[in-house]
Amino acid sequence: MKTRMIIVAAPSGAGKSSFVERITREDSRLVDIVTFTTRSIRQGETPGLQYNFIDHADFEQKIKEGFFVEWAKVHTNFYGTSYSSLETAWNQGKTAIMDIDIQGVATFKSKFPDAKTVFIHPPSIDELRRRIEKRDGKVPADIEVRMANAEKEIREASKFDYQIVNDVFEKSYGEFKKIVEDLLA
């Protein structure tokens, strides 16, 4: 039986969004679940494509309304996944795939034990730092928070069903694609 939910997690800057965005373009059996966030939009992002961007007050109201399957405060912003986005994917007969933070993975696994999880490792902590520093608008304090969180997240990787090191993107993506294809068979 094919998997109904694939969860991809990684430290910020390890490549999880790139993997998920590409595989959903290439495989029509998948729907990328777009999460909600209170963080600022980055250059090149389109609202509703990478994230649904909302302010803190709206996010907190949605929490009270029970709108989210899971939500978490990551770094200094909120992120959450709506029930309706999953229901829409499943009603279309598709597998939901999403990139979320480590906190969200535990919540999803408690509610959906059959969900499959993939952890994307950076090639090294130094390379991860370089990738994060290269992003627009990162202040040193934010970089340090992300690096501290990354070390904690990497320690959780053994709890995942699959692990990939994103050292050479095409090779790593090929490994990821094979895992997803096997889960959809």
From Swiss-Prot:
GO molecular function terms noted in the UniProt entry: ATP binding; guanylate kinase activity
Residue ranges of coiled coil: none
Superkingdom, taxonomy of origin: Bacteria
Localization per Swiss-Prot or TrEMBL: Cytoplasm
Catalysed reactions, as listed in the record: GMP + ATP = GDP + ADP
Enzyme class: transferase
Enzyme Commission number(s) of this protein: 2.7.4.8
Pfam families assigned to the protein according to its UniProt record, in alphabetical order: Guanylate_kin
Sorted UniProt keywords: ATP-binding, Cytoplasm, Kinase, Nucleotide-binding, Transferase
InterPro entries: GK/Ca_channel_bsu (IPR008145), Guanylate_kin-like_dom (IPR008144), Guanylate_kinase (IPR017665), Guanylate_kinase_CS (IPR020590), P-loop_NTPase (IPR027417)
Record SMART domains: GuKc
Ranges of residues in domain Guanylate kinase-like: 3-181
Positions that bind ATP: A10, P11, S12, G13, A14, G15, K16, S17
An example Gene Ontology CC term for this record: cytosol
Function of the protein: Essential for recycling GMP and indirectly, cGMP.
Family statement: Belongs to the guanylate kinase family.
Identification of the protein by name: Guanylate kinase
